């Protein structure tokens, strides 16, 4: 589980997702957590739900609260994709649910020699299985 710095809604805030939190997102949205990224269904409603779950260790805020704050931030000139969507995607990948290859693609600074060798071996095995 990776903590992703996210100070947009409060100083020193970070978000994270673990299996329990991903289950909460699935219950709230009716969609499998992995499908959110794979099917590119990260719309505004989904963003507010994910933010309410991924940041709840700081304060319990509703998706509606995040929608209102996002509106204010957009009016102030933030970029939704750069400032909100990309960190949320990193947070989802940081949970590990999308697999090691996606994780290391988004967090290349954490790639070690042993992890690189493991990913290479997994790719070779996947090709053999085709």
Which ranges hold each PLM region?
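Charged interaction scaffolds used for protein-protein
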Residues: 1-7, 27-40, 45, 57-130
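Glycine-centered positions within short beta-strands or beta-hairpins
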Residues: 8-12
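Short amphipathic alpha-helical "interface-anchor" segments enriched in bulky aromatics
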Residues: 15, 23-29
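Residue-level signal for threonine
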Residues: 18
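Short, structured surface segments that line ligand/substrate-binding pockets
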Residues: 54
């Amino acid at each position: 589980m990776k903590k992703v710095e996210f100070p947009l809604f409060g100083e020193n805030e970070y978000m994270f997702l673990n299996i329990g939190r991903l289950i909460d997102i699935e219950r709230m949205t009716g969609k499998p957590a992995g499908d959110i990224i794979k099917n590119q269904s990260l719309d505004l409603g989904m963003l507010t739900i994910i933010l309410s779950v991924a940041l709840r260790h700081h304060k319990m805020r509703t998706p509606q609260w995040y929608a209102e704050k996002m509106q204010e931030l957009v009016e102030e000139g933030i970029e939704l994709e750069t400032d909100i969507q990309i960190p949320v995607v990193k947070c989802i990948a940081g949970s590990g649910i999308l697999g090691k290859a996606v994780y290391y693609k988004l967090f290349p600074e954490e790639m070690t020699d042993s992890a690189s060798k493991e990913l290479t071996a997994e790719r070779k095995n996947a090709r053999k299985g085709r």
